[in-house]
C-alpha cells in the first residue's frame, strides 16, 4: 500500500532513482494505491545527466509493492521493494527500459507497453 509521503524506487532508465508520492489518483479521498495504480510524485534523487531533474513533478504507475497482492485464484505475491515507472500524460513510459520483474496486474490495468518492456512478468 502506497500513500502520501511514501518513497519508491524508480524501475526504469529515466535517470530518477527515488520518488516521493504526494497524491494517489482515482478518487477524491483515496488513501492507498497498489500495483497498477497511478500516483503523482516528486523526484527526490537523480543520476547525473538524466531526463528528469530533482524536484520535478511526474506521474508514475506502481509496478511492485512490499504489501501482499491477493489474486482471484487464491495465490499471493510480494516483492522486496516498492517501485514505480514514470509515465507521461498518455500513460506511456518515459524510459526505454524497465528493470526487474513486474506484476501481471499491470497488463490488466491497460499498461501494455510497460509489461512488454519488462524482462519478467509474474
From Swiss-Prot:
GO terms under biological process:
translation
List the Gene3D superfamilies hit by this protein, alphabetically: Ribosomal protein L14
SMART domains attached here? Answer: Ribosomal_L14
Q: Cross-referenced InterPro entries, in alphabetical order?
A: Ribosomal_uL14 (IPR000218), Ribosomal_uL14_bac-type (IPR005745), Ribosomal_uL14_CS (IPR019972), Ribosomal_uL14_sf (IPR036853)
Q: Which UniProt keywords apply?
A: Ribonucleoprotein, Ribosomal protein, RNA-binding, rRNA-binding
Q: Name one GO molecular function term.
A: structural constituent of ribosome
Example GO CC term: the record gives: cytosolic large ribosomal subunit
Check the record and name the NCBIfam families matching this protein. rplN_bact (TIGR01067)
Can you state the subunit structure given in the record?
A: Part of the 50S ribosomal subunit. Forms a cluster with proteins L3 and L19. In the 70S ribosome, L14 and L19 interact and together make contacts with the 16S rRNA in bridges B5 and B8.
Q: What biological function has been recorded for the protein in this entry? A: Binds to 23S rRNA. Forms part of two intersubunit bridges in the 70S ribosome.
The family annotation for this protein states:
Belongs to the universal ribosomal protein uL14 family.
Question: What is the designated name of this protein?
Answer: Large ribosomal subunit protein uL14
Tell me which species this is from: Chlamydia trachomatis serovar D (strain ATCC VR-885 / DSM 19411 / UW-3/Cx)
Lineage, highest ranks first: Bacteria, Pseudomonadati, Chlamydiota, Chlamydiia, Chlamydiales
Query: What gene does the UniProt entry assign to this protein?
Result: rplN
Amino acid at each position: 500500500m502506497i500513500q502520501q509521503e511514501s518513497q519508491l524506487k524508480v524501475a526504469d532508465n529515466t535517470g530518477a532513482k527515488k520518488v516521493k508520492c504526494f497524491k494517489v489518483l482515482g478518487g477524491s479521498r483515496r488513501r492507498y494505491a497498489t500495483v497498477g495504480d497511478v500516483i503523482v510524485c516528486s523526484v527526490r534523487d537523480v543520476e547525473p545527466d538524466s531526463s528528469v531533474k530533482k524536484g520535478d513533478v511526474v506521474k508514475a504507475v506502481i509496478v511492485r509493492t512490499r504489501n501482499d497482492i491477493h489474486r482471484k485464484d487464491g495465490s499471493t505475491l510480494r516483492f522486496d521493494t516498492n517501485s514505480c515507472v514514470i509515465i507521461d500524460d498518455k500513460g506511456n513510459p518515459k524510459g526505454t527500459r524497465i528493470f526487474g520483474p513486474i506484476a501481471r496486474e499491470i497488463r490488466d490495468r491497460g499498461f501494455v507497453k510497460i509489461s512488454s518492456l519488462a524482462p519478467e512478468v509474474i
